[in-house]
Amino acid sequence: MTKFVFVTGGVVSSLGKGIASASLAAILESRGLKVTLIKLDPYINVDPGTMSPFQHGEVFVTDDGAETDLDLGHYERFIETRMKQSNNFTTGRIYQSVLEKERRGDYLGKTVQVIPHVTNEIQEYIKRGAGLGTPDAVDVAICEVGGTVGDIESLPFLEAVRQLALKQGPNNTAFVHLTYLPWIATAGELKTKPTQHTVQKLREIGIQPDALLCRAQHQVPEEEKEKISLFTNVPEWGVISMWDVDTIYKVPRMLHEQGLDGLICDKLRLNTPPTNLKRWDDLVHETEHPQGEVKIAMVGKYVELSDAYKSVNEALKHAGMQSHVAVKITHVDSETISDANARDKLSQYDAILVPGGFGSRGVEGKISTARYARENKVPYLGICLGMQVATIEYARHVAGLEGANSTEFDPKSANPVIALITEWKDADGTVKTRDENSDLGGTMRLGAQSSDVQAGTLAHSIYGDVVTERHRHRYEANVQYLDQLREAGLVISALTQREQLTEIVELPKEVHPWYIGVQFHPEFKSTPWSGHPLFNAFVKAAIERQKAPRKP
């Protein structure tokens, strides 16, 4: 029977519920259990697809084309289970489903209310995410409830998980509450009162935590744990310190050494082999003992919030581990770059990466970045928009297509080398269409797609005959310009079979040592255990660049 662990948060947001949940999942997985994670988001958006990266951070895309919370990226990097649409849902999706049922008459004329209709729907989504009653059912489903206890938005979710725990029984459910202990410098002590209050709020709802994860800058002293235990009705061994660390990959070991997984297994009556965290220890050792360093410039539009590029940042770090080097990433605002100052801004880096993005702001700076990398033989990786700006730059300055641009930025461009995709096959094989008047939400080319890779290319040396990666974009290289770009020397090394959509562009080895742009998002499939072949090759190219003489 599937067991459930519900992870809630209190006092403030952004405490790291996602990392805590993923770490617990990793420990349980190391005990031989089949684990999945489910993220419950209390906002009314149907999904985060139309939300600003400045507000929400990265949108993580799954193989089945779901646009999800960035925490699902942590989940995939920490455990073996691949995430799907059913692993993330929002208040908006729940209400959408309830209203559709009401319109169909599924509620038989009843007055539709938060309790029981919305809370029942939440429970059904949770059970679906856990695969309950199917061959895909897991041993343990860890459900992270977004938001903060006390917020009005989270109340239906908390009520739903309370009800689900009651139905499943005490030996099939556990509650873990993440809280914050502020350090008052003038008093020289940690304060436990906010934690007492947040647990009190949780107990008023009808939820008694089995474990408290106490976030603080440093380890929580034993006397403070005793005090917290007394006032929250949580046994002392369930009050667990979760302090700041220099790498998130230390968290599984931290939680295990304080007995969190043992507590959960006892509560859920799970008889498992001992925990084996050797590969996590090896991973931490690798991060702490690099044999060198490479400097990479990430030229983007959302650099004020590093979470906007969370998976790219992690993929670069993973690739560094594969080559035993530390990757020092500098986020450079593309609005600050032009042809005139690109050398001053970028010459100190070993490689350049231009990630994805939407809208015209900062695009010319990205085009200047691609030009600098091409002309100065700097290793270049363009992802999604990064591939498109590389194509625009090449069209303008090599192919002689004056005014070349994307119709996203200039609808009246004389040479629209990048244009809106009007028809494509989605991840599940269905043919989708759209035009400039279509809704923004849920109308992109999304999910895993496969393409053949041209032999003898850089892409082929990385991927082999076929590339399968996840997509999230509306615009694509214009098929009408491919022959002109090829004649000018641009290598189009991967195309989709049906629509002939460009997946990868690159420069020949004799022209540039390492220059490639991909329309997809390879960062979503990188893991700390093996990295990702494209990022691994990119970091190796940066290492080679270090050895080469630089232009003054």
Curated annotation (Swiss-Prot):
The active site is at C384 (nucleophile), H521, E523. The keyword Heme does not apply. It is an enzyme of class 6 (ligase). The keyword ATP-binding applies. Residues 295-548 form the Glutamine amidotransferase type-1 domain. One of its GO terms (cellular component) is cytosol. Gene3D superfamilies: 3.40.50.880, P-loop containing nucleotide triphosphate hydrolases. Allosterically activated by GTP, when glutamine is the substrate; GTP has no effect on the reaction when ammonia is the substrate. The allosteric effector GTP functions by stabilizing the protein conformation that binds the tetrahedral intermediate(s) formed during glutamine hydrolysis. Inhibited by the product CTP, via allosteric rather than competitive inhibition. GO terms for molecular function: ATP binding; CTP synthase activity; glutaminase activity; identical protein binding; metal ion binding. Mg(2+) binds at D71, E144. Its EC number is 6.3.4.2. UTP binds at S13, K191, T192, K193, P194, T195, Q196, K227. CTP binds at S13, D151, I152, E153, K191, T192, K193, P194, T195, Q196, K227. Keywords: ATP-binding, Glutamine amidotransferase, Ligase, Magnesium, Metal-binding, Nucleotide-binding, Pyrimidine biosynthesis. L-glutamine binds at G357, L385, G386, M387, Q388, E408, R474. Pathway: Pyrimidine metabolism; CTP biosynthesis via de novo pathway; CTP from UDP: step 2/2. GO terms for biological process: 'de novo' CTP biosynthetic process; pyrimidine nucleobase biosynthetic process. Catalyzes the ATP-dependent amination of UTP to CTP with either L-glutamine or ammonia as the source of nitrogen. Regulates intracellular CTP levels through interactions with the four ribonucleotide triphosphates. PANTHER family: CTP SYNTHASE, CTP SYNTHASE-RELATED. CTPSs have evolved a hybrid strategy for distinguishing between UTP and CTP. The overlapping regions of the product feedback inhibitory and substrate sites recognize a common feature in both compounds, the triphosphate moiety. To differentiate isosteric substrate and product pyrimidine rings, an additional pocket far from the expected kinase/ligase catalytic site, specifically recognizes the cytosine and ribose portions of the product inhibitor. Homotetramer. Belongs to the CTP synthase family. This is CTP synthase. The lineage of its organism: Bacteria, Pseudomonadati, Pseudomonadota, Betaproteobacteria, Burkholderiales. The gene is pyrG.
